[in-house]
Amino acid sequence: MDYDDSDFQNQNLHLAGEANNKFPPVLQPYALPKFDFDDTLNTHLRFDSLGESEAFLGIEGNEDNNWIEDFSRGSSGIVFSSGATESCAISRHNNVWSEATSSESVAMLLNSVGQDEVIVREDTIKKSDTSHELGCTMETVEPGQTSHERSLSKEETVNLQPNPSVDDTPGESSVVKTDDGQEQVLVKDDSPTAVEEASVEEKNSILTSNTATVEAIDTTDLGKIGTETTDNLLDQTEEKANVESRMEDDCSDGNVQTIITCSGELNNQSTLLPETSNDENVISDHIQSSYNRNDLTADARSILVEGHSDSHIDSASEVEKVEAENIGKTAKPDLKEIELSDVTVLERGDQAPSTLEVGGQDVSGTECQDLLVSTVHTSVAVEASLELAGELTTITNSVSIEKPELLSHQHMEVITSEHESTFQIETETYPQIHVFETSESVYISTMDSMVEAREGGVSKKSDNEGSARTSNLEQSMELPVNANDRDQDVKNSQILSESVVSGSVGYVSGGSTSELAESESQSDSIPTDKSETMIDSSLNLEELQPLSQDGAPAVSLTSSIDLHMVKTSSDDSDQGSYSETKKVYGEPENGQTVPPVDASCSGSQMDQEARKRAEGTKQSTYSVEGCPRSEGSKDAVDADGVGQVLQQQSEELIFEENVVTEAVKAPETLSVLDKDNKNEMPITSSLPILGSEAGKDGQEEDNTAASGGIMAAGTPVTHPKGDAIVLGDSRASTCSESSVKSYVTAIEDAATNLKTPLDSFPTVKTSELQFNNTETNSVKKPEDQNISGFMSAGSPVLNRNETSSSEMNLTPDQLKAGKISKAVIFSQATLVSPIVVGSPSTSSLDKTAAKSSKAKSERKPRRTSKSVGKETSRKGTSVKGATPIEQFQSGGKTNAVNQSLASHIQITQSTEKQRSLQSPALKAFGSLSTPTASLPDLNSSALSSILRRPFTDLQQVQLRAQIFVYGALIQGTAPDEAYMISAFGGADGGKGSWEKSWRTCVVRAQKSLVATPETPLQSRPGKTETPSAGHTNSKESSGTNPMIPLSSPLWSLSTSVDTLQSSSVQRGSAATHQPLLSASHAHQTPPTQNIVGHNTPWMSPLPFRNAWLASQQTSGFDVGSRFPVYPITDPVKLTPMKESSMTLSGAKHVQSGTSSNVSKVTPTLEPTSTVVAPAQHSTRVKSRKRKKMPVSVESGPNILNSLKQTELAASPLVPFTPTPANLGYNAGTLPSVVSMTAVPMDLVSTFPGKKIKSSFPSPIFGGNLVREVKQRSVLSEDTIEKLKEAKMHAEDASALATAAVSHSEYVWKQIEQQSHAGLQPETQDRLASAAVAIAAAAAVAKAAAAAANVAANAALQAKLMAEEASLPNASDQGLPKSYDSILPGQGTPASILKGEGAVVNSSSVLIAAREASKKRVEAATAATKRAENMDSIVKAAELASEAVSQAGILVSMGHPPLLNKLVEAGPSNYWRQAQESQEVQPCKTVVLEKETVSTSEGTFAGPKIVQTEFGGSVNTADGVSGPVPATGKLKGQEGDKYADLAKNNDVVFEPEVGSKFSIDAQQTIKATKNEDIKEGSNVEVFKEEPGLRTAWYSANVLSLEDDKAYVLFSDLSVEQGTDKLKEWVALKGEGDQAPKIRPARSVTALPYEGTRKRRRAALGDHIWKIGDRVDSWVHDSWLEGVITEKNKKDENTVTVHFPAEEETLTIKAWNLRPSLVWKDGKWIECSSSGETISSSHEGDTPKEKRPRLGTPALVAEVKDTSMKIVDDPDLGKPPQTGVLNLGVSENTFNIGKSTREENKPDPLRMKRTGLQKQGSKVIFGVPKPGKKRKFMDVSKHYVSEASTKTQERKEPVKPVRSIVPQNSGIGSWKMPSKTISIEKQTTISRPKTFKPAPKPKEKPGATARIIPRKDSRNTTASDMESDESAENRGPGSGVSFKGTVEEQTTSSSHDTGSKNSSSLSTNKGRVAPTAGRLAKIEEDKALAENSSKTSEGMEPRRSIRRIQPTSRLLEGLQTSMMTSKIPSVSHSKSHLSQSKK
């Protein structure tokens, strides 16, 4: 029964058609591409897909075909996304499909269905148990359950369920669990359960997802509560309340057939709810409900809404939502808190909580993590049950919040136990009050702190209940406590989008809730509260019913479910589920039509968003806006309009809600809150909105419930909409609410009429469940599965009720409800769809519902399992599901959805068909769901009985026909029409629903026949699809989508479901086998694929490989466009639709990774512009077309797009997202382009990301341009317009830049005026900062304008190229086909193969080869254009980097220069003048200058910004990322920056050895000159007084008179007062004594606020040596001391002795700064001996080596790419700045070019390496052997130095290298390895000769490091170097060394090392020649600064590099060098090799 993932995969491969061609469809073992339903099938790959496909196919006789559905569903439909299945390791009972097509297999299928189904039922139930077991073997703990009753109850529930035995087992497990000490047991069991669940998932997706998850949690809870009370409850419920009877009746109507006991439990629950008095019953009933996986879940929720008080439901909803949010982000922390409180109340509730816990842990334990989510969902289910009982509700909510297993279980327990006792006791007494209190306390606990909840609960309820509630709430609250400031968070959530997401979400919800709760249940004032109140007031089912009539009840139900969903969302949010939601969220606001597309894209994006909570927050905010809009609609909708409005708004809402849940649970909530303003909390706001809407409608209860539910989840947005409520819920809460309502409707009004509102609500609820499921899927596979199951359990039932009973019954209402439901379903998508399908399939709605929910649950989990490892995947599926719905609903794409859902509708029923426009879309999305629905049937007792029933002849015929249809589809051929008719059954075989799709399939199959069989997706695209690809693909895709629900195995051919298939499409497009890889691997591996995988996998394997491929990545979001795709049945007409399918292909082709990025990007994009997502789809479609011009397109927009895509994950470059396919295309087709892409990416992020992204790139590259390019009509007018638009953007940017510049000038003028006003220092600082910032902004604006212009040109060029490539290719059908398969990489085999998702078949290879040959010519021409394009892009990047670097420097300035300095410098001259002004004569002055230049004490700009010919363009500082593509590499930003800077010749990278000191020194130097001390100046005053430490104290100059300064001490107070000490201090010292006052040194010595690296670079990089004189920051003063000891373990810790204080302290390096010495009337940094510095850095390397490195600091002047070493006597003097401002020479100088060797990059790297190696590497001693060699070499070299030099001279290359290493290792790195060895030798000998050299050497090393950074952006060292460079920025040392290194490198390379060798000949000689200037500089200082600064940061890596290059170097050196030199050579070699690397 179980299959290994690999096994399954193999089967899938076969099924997918890996070998499909080879075998007849009948004989082929269809290892189906993991159909979604298959994945859902935890037990077997069954014909659920058939049943589902039946639904999908729109078979009319759904009910008649229930046997099929039951049969299939039992095995949980086949899910095509094998990836998901694999990820979850879901096994199936039998690979039914392998034998599916043969008669024997049919017979076997029937048998297996009977047996397997039964087994599955059992498994499912057991799984359910397992789920419970997930929670723990809890379910097996039957005897230990809180009461025998429970176990019985559970058993009864089991009996109700199809598999009584299974149910019993779960019940028992639950009981045992409970007995164990539920929480612990649950927790303990959870892990095993999780494992078990995982296996279950592996075995049976259905079980895991549906049965296990839903049932596990629900059952567990039910088992605990239900076991005791299930029977009793059932009886009691029936006995107890009038509502109960209604509920029962409804339940019976809806659930009677469903053996799950949906009706019974529903009845019980309903009764319980109304009867508040029987809380225990409610709980147990609810538990039963939960127990009945889907039905129970739905029931519980519906009951809560109906039977329980609305307040309970609401509160539960809210709590759940909050919890969900918390769980997602803060669930885990909360869990811990809750655990404590929960434990306290665990006694009675233990069982229930344990059950929940089991579910939760199960999830966590599961490899897929679905269980976790599942657990959460389970918790939710339990919560729903709890909600039935007032206290239980609270606990449930609490659990939901917990989301982590512990919390949910514990909460459950607490509430359960209290509930049971309190409720039982007080049930009668406080029917409504009880509910009321519960709701309130739940609310409070969830929203507010638990304390608040307790208060509310206690005060309102009897002590018992209050206590229970309080404890429950407490637990709940504790979860939220995570976000204790939830309310605050809500308010700040937008700001704190990210933090809010994790903790805030919960809090936001919590805070609002608590207020709402406090506001009270009556809380009309606060809708949330109101909803609670309303719930309270309408505790009775009667009230619920009215609500249900109004549609308000849906809201209440939504509440409960909302929380559930939120919970799931929360979890998913982290993983990306939220992102999806978020994406959707934003879209709804944007527009219904677009949002669907976005939703489709959401799948991938979700992950991204999850990663980017902030982004998510934005989206959530956006969604919120939509929400209010929805709200407005809500009033209108609340009554009849609810369904319709809901549909439209629902989509929006769903998206919004998802967004909220996913990305920024809290922030989104906040957004909602803000917009809604109704509630303080987002949840609150949601609820309030709903409430208010409901209030308007006059349905208090309904409103409250709905609003509350929605609120919790992010529903807030939804709630405000009214429809939005449903939708929001449908996303998060809506579904659950709808589910509840659905149940209520089904139960209460199922027999009666599901009232429109009710109907829509049920729909909503289903949606929410689905959404939860979706989120769960995304979040964790195991958890997701469980959650899915759980959600499915509730949702499917609701959906089923809704569709089967309610929907079918209420055709008109259904349409409304259907829309709502559809929206909901869409959000849930897969789950809902299957449910709907299931219901139609089963004749009895209830049974179907139960089955559906179960199957759905399972199925969804399977889907999720598919993407076990990938939240995105899962999310994608769910998103897919949700998105399509949302898209349909929100977007005007409902038509498309309807079409794609048509089959679903047919399957579901004619009634469902009515909903088909809405619901079908869901189903299409939820194709998997549909199978899931079937699966649930199998799991239910009714199902089991059905399974046991023999098939009728007609059924057998139908099943066989379905098998054949499916086989044909798998094979990629069109099924026979006769088979289709038979398969669908009914009078006309449901022809109306599938004929279009079928015809499309036939056409597509004919066109792609050749490619389909063996060729992978690509081959199809390459082959027949080409011309028809555009039309056929779009048509087929659209056709596929409508025709085939994602889950429908039969519909693997592309149909309307193409959207769904998008992911599975890759499978289908790849051909049967290709789909295998594509679906299973692609879906599994890439998040996008995963997204697709859940829904589309089984669909994709079939006919539309290409389109499907494309859709893989964007399938989730593309679903939106897919709807259009459906309409796209007209091939080319619907570009968006085409885009969708094409885009998907492109995305998929692009690469899984790219796809994922793209998807993620899409969500990001969505918020920016809804159009973008469609554009993206468009783009993708165009990509297909673009295939013609793969190269050209790539080069321009594609590259940008790809860059953006790549960056998208990290940066919000959504605009380029639309070209994910292009990116893939680029990468696949043109590796070179890809690399270039990398550069543009940096550029994009740096500049386009900021500017172009929003304005230009988005429209042009965002997808419009690309899309246009990709369109068949090569360059459409649209594209041209986009290009024009881009040009306009560039012009606008220019104008903006001009404005910025003018503004900057104005500001500067103002500053100049102000500078004379004698403003306070703070004011001056602010002004200076503002001026700098403005200058930076102006610079950036300029750069941006230039870049925009360049980009526009590049885009135009790319467009032209695309046209060139496209036109011919467009005519070539083969190309379009290829395009489909490989949108972006059509031209290159690599792209084809890559695009295929790593699925390489012979066909794909052939196609790739073919494509490669076709494209060779194109590539040649395109390459040139591309090169030009890249050039332009690089130029733009350079400009951007320039601007950024300038801006970065400005921004990075630790504190702004004085106003007068600023004024002196002026806006354009500021930097240079600042440098000069800072220049100081002392050697350290240079360093100081450099620091000054960067003006960032905290952040040191590694490169010095020199005003060169570039016109003062500043290179990027360390912190600033200004990648200059000139290098052609875009690796580390910093490295890139440096490299770019170097290339720009504007920056000289200097080691910042003394950077910390440099700044200090600069300021110190200024201080030295009294002129620097002015009024308002910050100074340091030296005080030696008794009672005071003798130290330098910070002070502020208040006034200056007579050479005295009146200072106010910052840290010294008057002896007995709080006033700061003020005193007069002489500005000058007596005689030669140092003055007691000096300008304050920068805070460099203080901990930097920047990155640790920077701080370390600046401070830690300073290598402190023993004996160094330092100032230590101690007790707010700088104490002068001497380092006496260094901590060997911690480099950053030194022992400093303070002679003045006669004490020794251990100080951290960052609290040290070099002491300043008064010398020659100046403050000069007293540098430690070079040895000290080197030693500290070296660690390994001998100090001698450092000295060797250079006696004087090396200053490099770069001229004509050659560096001249200047001996700078005073590094600190202006010459240094001159060096820094290397003007023309620097401009000319290119680091890469500096060596002038063929290996320019290598030389650069070498430089870096050399510096690093000799510096940090040697110091750190990474290369120990190298060190030894070095030492040995030193002696040897010393001896043979002359000979070496001679050799070097003779061998230019060798000498150069040797020379360079001598200088700093940089040169050596650059130089040939042999040369390096020589140099090293020489260098080593020098160290012996001259020790100071090592320091210079070190400096050079540092410099080299920095420089190498520039060169080796890609190298790991680059990062280090950049850091080190930042650290070692000491201008003097860094520059001097750089000069030496560079010059040496240059000269060595140029002079063949003759010069170098000569310079190296003598220790000093070498240093001096290479760095003659350095020689003049004080060697000690230079050495100390440089070596110390360079050594630390950079050396370690360099050392490592040296080691690596050693072998190479040695090889070369050994041959050409003396053996004595070899050792050193080897070391230098290692440097070289690393640099090369």
From Swiss-Prot:
Disruption phenotype: Swollen root tips, disordered root cell morphology and root elongation inhibition under salt stress, accompanied by increased accumulation of reactive oxygen species (ROS) such as hydrogen peroxide H(2)O(2) in the roots. Reduced accumulation of cellulose and pectin but increased lignin levels under high salinity. Salt-hypersensitivity is exacerbated in plants lacking also IMPA1 and IMPA2.
Any single GO CC term annotated in Swiss-Prot or TrEMBL for this entry: plasmodesma
Endoplasmic reticulum keyword on record: no
Compositionally biased region (Basic and acidic residues): 147-157, 454-466, 1794-1805
RNA-binding in keyword set: no
Ranges of Basic residues composition bias in the record: 853-865, 1179-1189, 2028-2037
Polar residues bias: start-end ranges: 158-176, 515-526, 1025-1041, 1151-1171, 1874-1886, 1942-1964, 2013-2023
Pfam families hit by this protein: Agenet
Location of this chain's protein in the cell: Nucleus
This protein's UniProt keywords: Nucleus, Stress response
Biological processes per GO annotation: cell wall organization; regulation of gene expression; regulation of meristem structural organization; regulation of root development; response to salt stress
Domain of life: Eukaryota
Compositionally biased spans, kind Low complexity: 504-514, 841-852
Gene Ontology MF terms: promoter-specific chromatin binding
Disordered: annotated segments: 141-179, 454-487, 504-531, 567-637, 686-705, 837-893, 1011-1045, 1148-1197, 1729-1748, 1793-1812, 1841-2037
Tissue: Mainly expressed in seedlings, flower buds and stems, and, to a lower extent, in leaves and siliques.
Family matches, as SMART domains: Agenet (SM00743)
Quaternary data: Interacts with importin alpha IMPA1 and IMPA2, required for nuclear-localized proteins import.
Biological role stated in the UniProt entry: Under salt stress, appears to prevent the accumulation of reactive oxygen species (ROS) in roots and required for the maintenance of cell wall integrity (cellulose, pectin and lignin composition) by interacting with importin alpha (e.g. IMPA1 and IMPA2) and binding to the promoter of several ROS- and cell wall-related genes to regulate their expression. Necessary for cells organization in meristems and root elongation zones as well as for root elongation in high salinity, but not upon osmotic stress.
Name under which the protein is recorded: Protein SWOLLEN 1
Organism: Arabidopsis thaliana
Lineage: Eukaryota, Viridiplantae, Streptophyta, Embryophyta, Tracheophyta
Name of the encoding gene: SWO1
